[in-house]
């Protein structure tokens, strides 16, 4: 499959770019986490260390993979692709549990730091990285992984990029493999949050002022969420744009146990899930041949 490798820029990536620039300053791993860690998991504090940062990822990997039916034994022979690895918060745990891991991100500097993080807290011999240069396509061959995992990443992409990455996930997954993809959908607060986000992203485009705003936590949290996608929107796109010879089965939409979620697409199981943000939902599915 041929891909367009021309780089594209998305304004909501500005905080990641700013954080990525700071990872290249030569500071220690702990200093980098204190300066940029909140971009990935909202943790802050002058005493935050890389080890603390990775421990939060270890816990979430354990919890989510258990909820999705993947214990350590089930992962031992699997190659996992992580869309949106950042500097390796969750990647380290994946390398300790899986046969091999491919970490991808829109920022090449993050991938360099991811390699360093895994070197300290994971198994770097199992890791390779791939830059998502255009924000929408994976520079990987067809049928090369068993699991595609993405958490708190697709919501920061442009809508069309997030949908493209969803079908790209299918493309690179082998027959019988699994998709574990996290999205954000509409909640009442979005009536105010989305217009504020649009305004903030416009401010980020202003020279000097924009760069300063993009490194502040409050500004970033307003402007970095670029889309809202319902399960039916994602499933309709996948149905219409599935890679040749592939389809998804065993489709489950997992949503917060504190909310009610309705899915109109036929053949989809809807399940409540504990400890999930009210605005988030997960798509889990098996990739099969047609």
Residue ranges of each PLM-predicted region?
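A short glycine-rich, Lys/Arg-flanked "PGG" loop and its adjoining helix->strand segment in the class I
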Residues: 163-175
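Class I SAM-dependent methyltransferase core
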Residues: 82
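A short acidic, Gly/Pro-enriched loop at the edge of an enzyme's catalytic core
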Residues: 136-147
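Residues that mark the start of a beta-strand
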Residues: 78-79, 174
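A short SAM/SAH-binding and catalytic strip from SAM-dependent methyltransferases
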Residues: 147-160
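Class I (Rossmann-like) S-adenosyl-L-methionine-dependent methyltransferase catalytic domain
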Residues: 2-77, 87-127, 131-137, 157-162, ...
């Amino acid at each position: 499959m041929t891909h367009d490798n021309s780089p594209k820029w998305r304004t909501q990536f500005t905080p990641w770019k700013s954080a990525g620039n700071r990872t290249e300053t030569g500071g220690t791993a702990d200093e980098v986490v204190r300066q940029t860690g909140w971009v990935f998991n909202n943790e802050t504090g002058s005493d935050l260390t890389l080890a603390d940062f990775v421990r939060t990822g270890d816990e979430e990997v354990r919890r989510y993979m258990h909820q999705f039916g993947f214990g350590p034994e089930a992962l031992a022979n699997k190659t996992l692709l992580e869309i949106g690895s950042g500097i390796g918060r969750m990647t380290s745990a994946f390398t300790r549990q899986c046969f091999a891991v491919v970490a991808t991100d829109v920022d090449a500097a993050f991938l360099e730091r991811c390699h360093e993080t895994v070197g300290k807290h994971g198994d770097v011999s199992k890791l390779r990285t791939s830059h998502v240069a255009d924000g929408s396509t994976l520079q990987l061959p067809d049928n090369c992984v068993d699991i595609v995992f993405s958490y708190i990443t697709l919501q920061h992409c442009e809508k069309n990029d997030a949908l493209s990455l969803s079908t790209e996930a299918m493309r690179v997954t082998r027959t019988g493999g699994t998709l574990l993809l996290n999205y954000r959908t509409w909640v009442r607060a979005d009536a105010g949050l989305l217009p504020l986000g649009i305004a903030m992203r416009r401010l980020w485009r202003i020279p000097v002022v924009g760069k300063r705003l993009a490194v502040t936590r409050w500004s970033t949290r307003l402007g970095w969420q670029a889309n809202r996608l319902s399960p039916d929107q994602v499933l309709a796109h996948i149905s219409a744009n599935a890679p040749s010879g592939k389809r998804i089965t065993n489709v489950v939409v997992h949503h917060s146990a504190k909310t009610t979620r309705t899915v109109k697409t036929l053949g989809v199981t809807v399940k409540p899930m504990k400890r999930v943000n009210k605005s988030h939902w997960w798509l889990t599915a098996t990739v099969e041949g047609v």
